[in-house]
From Swiss-Prot:
SMART domains: DUF167. HAMAP family: UPF0235. It comes from Chlamydia trachomatis serovar D (strain ATCC VR-885 / DSM 19411 / UW-3/Cx). This is UPF0235 protein CT_388. It comes from the Bacteria. InterPro entries: DUF167 (IPR003746), YggU-like_sf (IPR036591).
Amino acid sequence: MRFLLKLLSKEKENILLEGFWVLEVRVTTKARENRVVCLEDGILRVRVTEVPEKGKANDAVVALLANFLSIPKSDVTLIAGEASRRKKVLLPRSIKAFLLEQFPSESSSTTGKKS
């Protein structure tokens, strides 16, 4: 498992594993409200109200993603970027379709089609 997490943390693209999807998340802390902003170039941009100390912002990101995606917090695993604005999160594979549904312009750019 440690080897897999090391491999994933070096990977720059969002990749699909059997049953899982690694999503890159860009976090803005100390925001006015917790919200998912957009999906741009395969990176999900989010804002959280928490400060980046003692894991508070990371916990807020996990809670925000779980709420936005309507999945349990236990299905959202932070695998890289604990001390960074750029994080990698392991999610169930089925979530990719949901995200592309929420951000249609991203789905056309990832499939090569123009809207």
